[in-house]
Amino acid sequence: MGIKNLKSLLLENKSLTILDDNLYKVYNGIFVDTMSIYIAVANCVRNLEELTTVFIKYVNGWVKKGGHVTLFIDRGSIKIKQDVRDKRRKYSKLTKDRKMLELEKCTSEIQNVTGFMEEEIKAEMQLKIDKLTFQIYLSDYDNIKISLNEILTHFNNNENVTLFYCDERDAEFVMCLEAKTQFSTTGEWPLIISTDQDTMLFASADNHPKMIKNLTQLFKFVPSAEDNYLAKLTALVNGCDFFPGLYGASITPNNLNKIQLFSDFTIDNIVTSLAIKNYYRKTNSTVDVRNIVTFINDYANLDDVYSYIPPCQCTVQEFIFSALDEKWNEFKSSYLESVPLPCQLMYALEPRKEIDVSEVKTLSSYIDFENTKSDIDVIKSISSIFGYSNENCNTIVFGIYKDNLLLSINNSFYFNDSLLITNTKSDNIINIGY
């Protein structure tokens, strides 16, 4: 659930570490994302009675460790999650259909078991049948809500357990918002229990240490500004509950070491992070990049986004080139596109030194509107006359690639309105910088 790969990415980035749960006995209160834990428990048991027993046992165990447990419970409909709900219903139906076929197969096979260890084999198959039957029952969301509400009645008179209903808001969102409020008065986050990876996005908003737990593991999370950036970038690229992500891109532990991380979640920094490969513009479609980035920022910062209209999915190419269009169009307004490249370069470069008369004559000799082929030596000569270098540049201003004049950002990549070339794959590019 939540943001794909975020937990593994934070583990890879060393801000999230796994601890021995047995070494930590006492917490300053415990906050639980109830539905995520309830579903996790339900997937491990065979019937409602067992689910009730196991869930209550978990809560009582948390009371012993935290003194007080707050169960955050989803309630009501969240309008901006309609698309997510529709997709989950579709996925749930496919899963239910698959499990029903599996149940039919097991029910048929158990009738034909005979011979050696017949009773043991039948007992094992019956356990599987019971579990499949229960999972099919829980594939109906109404059954989930009814069974959860029934279990929660066991805590109505328990002074050590508070039921906190989150009306038209995600429980994990409200939980982390309340945890921040508690921190402001006590100086310590409660233990957060959830299987939803959005929780780690919300917990990355400040650099204070946090303890986060799922059913089987305990984590210590000490996020830096870079981790907060990584969490937001992962929500943007891989998607979260309210934004489907950038189609055609994914952040994984395998490519994390190629991605530049920053402290500030700005458009320039985001595009730099995405520029781990070359991209070509495939369509003329543009998207409102600022709106997407603002939404991810506000969501991660626990601002109330539930009244927003969530951004639509776009491709990674549409995002990148829409993000770069403003810079390219600003440059293009003072750029002679229809003349040969040497002339384009002379017009685009701002002199960084005095140009003497002999150099002016040299530049004049390069003006040839009939010659559309570019000479590398001419390009280097023009750069030198204007006070620029082609090697060992601390700041790259332009790149020349196949008669294309490209802009550079953060010395990390080159681009125009139709292509982006990463600096790690720039053997065929002539740098112009200083």
UniProtKB/Swiss-Prot annotation:
GO molecular function: metal ion binding; nuclease activity
Protein localization: Virion
One Gene Ontology cellular component: virion component
GO biological process: DNA repair
Pfam families per UniProt: Pox_G5
Annotated keywords: DNA damage, DNA repair, Early protein, Hydrolase, Magnesium, Metal-binding, Nuclease, Virion
Role summary: Putative nuclease that seems to be required for double-strand break repair, homologous recombination, and production of full-length viral genomic DNA.
Name of this chain's protein: Putative nuclease OPG089
UniProt organism field: Monkeypox virus
